[in-house]
Amino acid sequence: MEAVEIVATITPDQELLAAAALHDTVEDTDVTEEQIRAEFGDRIASLVAAESEELPVGISETESWRSRKQAAINRLAAASHDAKIVAMGDKLSNMRAIARDYEEIGDELWTRFHAPNGKSDHEWHYRGLAASLAELSNTSAYKEFVYLLEKTFCK
C-alpha cells in the first residue's frame, strides 16, 4: 500500500490510486489484465498493464534481467503522464526498501536479486528509471527517489 500513499502525494485521482494498489497484481498473481479490466475498467487495467513485466519463456530471470529492465525503462519513457505517476509510487517504494536494506546489510543485499552484476546493474536500472520519470521532477516523490538513489549508489 506504500505505492498508493506515494501516488496520493502527487494526485487525488482515484483511478491512479487504484492502479497503484493493483500495480503488481498481474505480475505476482494469477489475475489477468482482462480480469482487472472487467472489474475496474479500461483505464485502471491499462495503467496496471503498463507496470507489468513479462518473463520470457525458456530464459532464466538472470539471463533476461538486463533486457527486461531496458524494455521497462523504454516503456516508461514513452508512457503517459498518468502511467508515470503510478510507476513513481512503485519505484519509490522499491527504492525505499533497497536503501533501508542496504543500510542494514550492505552489499549482501544485491545477492537477493537476479541482476548478474549486482549493485552496478541496479544502479544502471534505477538511473534509467529516474531519467524516464524526469517529468515528475517537481514532485517530492521524485526528489526523494533521486536522493535515495544517490545515497545508495554513491557509497
Residue ranges of model-derived segments:
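Active-site helical microenvironments for divalent-metal-assisted chemistry
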Residues: 1-155
